[in-house]
Amino acid sequence: MKDMSNKKIFKKYSRVAGLLTAALIVGNLVTANADSNKQNTANTETTTTNEQPKPESSELTTEKAGQKMDDMLNSNDMIKLAPKEMPLESAEKEEKKSEDNKKSEEDHTEEINDKIYSLNYNELEVLAKNGETIENFVPKEGVKKADKFIVIERKKKNINTTPVDISIIDSVTDRTYPAALQLANKGFTENKPDAVVTKRNPQKIHIDLPGMGDKATVEVNDPTYANVSTAIDNLVNQWHDNYSGGNTLPARTQYTESMVYSKSQIEAALNVNSKILDGTLGIDFKSISKGEKKVMIAAYKQIFYTVSANLPNNPADVFDKSVTLKELQRKGVSNEAPPLFVSNVAYGRTVFVKLETSSKSNDVEAAFSAALKGTDVKTNGKYSDILENSSFTAVVLGGDAAEHNKVVTKDFDVIRNVIKDNATFSRKNPAYPISYTSVFLKNNKIAGVNNRSEYVETTSTEYTSGKINLSHQGAYVAQYEILWDEINYDDKGKEVITKRRWDNNWYSKTSPFSTVIPLGANSRNIRIMARECTGLAWEWWRKVIDERDVKLSKEINVNISGSTLSPYGSITYK
């Protein structure tokens, strides 16, 4: 600041000095003119004594002096100093340019290394994603529909996952490419990472396509999204032209499946944004929570190749030396949001499959899982019935998706073909970025999103009404006791039990006798007892049947026969 002030003062007085110099020139001209007039007067007096000379007026003298000064100023001999060409201003520009060059040449590597190494954070906490918190829910609910009674049971569950490969959606590809810089903050956990854009050092990337050898590694001078994408395209084209041998490359398939209970649960289970699944597959979360539908989602990740970025030895290795600590701090780097480095990106395609049914069977998950694994379910009657009453949807992201963008069918064999088709890498079936992995720039530790969520697991069991068919063919007097409970639930999910009994309990019945006792679909804890009169004083009544846990069925056939001393009884189901 002091130097600049001195320069301004010097500039000011230089201009004053210039004005004084001009004034001095004018003075000299006036003096010289006056001396010349005196000399001319003396000569005139010598030659002519009688004639008085006419003195020259001061106005004329000044006018002549001014004219001479103008002539001098306009002559080529005069040095002209235009304001824009002042030597001092030019010097200031040169000095500023020099200072800028010094700043760009200044090395901030040590400063950035020290700061990033000193960042204090917990890897699990900065990338913690807390999903839903469940407080109130109805644990059980009973719904009566015609001859059906549906019990919807809800249980509170916890899920905690730490996936390291994060699904890529189209909206974030420009900040999830190999060697991209990100912030470990909430945006990252929600698959909407914040990018750190700054001047970078050259970066080496490697593609794992077979046969390329050292040609598989290239250096990108300025690792922006556009430049890295171009480099990857060049590597892929080079492989197709020189190393593929005209052959296709089979995909490496990763497979995960999960029943769907809530948005946060399926996000954590499959490591994918529920908005993608909801938008592409159309998941009816409301019907699932009501127990009206059961849904399973399977994700097939088919990887054609992976591109990796060389990990830095030190944090500052990724930055140009001119990048300052203040710049990184302005762009969000802090203890709460430490920097991340995208270490690798997988390219290929992802197939999402939705299996949906309104079946209330407890075997739905097993049936769906068997179908996905290619098991022949036709030999299993229960599984076959479930799949026949199910619908299937497949959505392909990446690859030649134009052929199988979205398929909805009742035939699971069609879904199997979608999964198998275009599962090889070729020019006609290109790869797209499907997932990526990031590391903390501080220590190259893998950054995994710590998903913590509560959800309600909803299961529904459907019961059908039944009946008891009593048949007495024995040569004795018989008595029955038929008891059961009817189950309902109040608005808080608490079980309400109503005791029921047959009106003819303990009434004596002679052979032949038969009757039908209807049972509601919510009947449980069925007890059936039948006894016969022996006529023996020491054992007047003898039990023929005594079953305390008879299961509800469409038809429960209770038969008694035989003699007083050799009675026979049986219970069969239909």
Swiss-Prot record:
Where found?
Secreted; Host cell membrane
What is the protein name stated in its UniProt record?
A: Streptolysin O
Signal peptide feature range: 1-36
Q: What do we know about how this protein assembles, alone or with others?
A: Homooligomeric pore complex of 35 to 50 subunits; when inserted in the host membrane.
Per the entry, what this protein does is: A cholesterol-dependent toxin that causes cytolysis by forming pores in cholesterol containing host membranes. After binding to target membranes, the protein undergoes a major conformation change, leading to its insertion in the host membrane and formation of an oligomeric pore complex. Cholesterol is required for binding to host membranes, membrane insertion and pore formation; cholesterol binding is mediated by a Thr-Leu pair in the C-terminus. Can be reversibly inactivated by oxidation.
Q: What is the lineage of its organism?
A: Bacteria, Bacillati, Bacillota, Bacilli, Lactobacillales
Q: Which domain of life is it from?
A: Bacteria
Which ranges belong to the motif Cholesterol binding? 564-565
Cite the record's Basic and acidic residues compositional bias ranges.
53-64
Q: Which Pfam families match?
A: Thiol_cytolys_C, Thiol_cytolysin
Any stretches that span the bilayer, and where are they? Answer: 263-276, 283-292, 361-370, 378-390
Which GO annotations describe the biological process of this protein? killing of cells of another organism
Region Disordered: start-end pairs: 37-64, 84-111
Task: State the species of origin.
Answer: Streptococcus dysgalactiae subsp. equisimilis
- Family per UniProt? Belongs to the cholesterol-dependent cytolysin family.
Q: Which spans does this entry mark as compositional bias, Low complexity?
A: 37-52
Location of motif Conserved undecapeptide in this chain is: 532-542
Give the bilayer topology. Answer: Multi-pass membrane protein
Q: Which gene encodes it?
A: slo
An example of a GO molecular function for this protein is:
toxin activity
Q: Show the GO cellular component annotation of the record.
A: extracellular region; host cell plasma membrane; membrane
- Keywords, ordered alphabetically: Cytolysis, Hemolysis, Host cell membrane, Host membrane, Lipid-binding, Membrane, Secreted, Signal, Toxin, Transmembrane, Transmembrane beta strand, Virulence
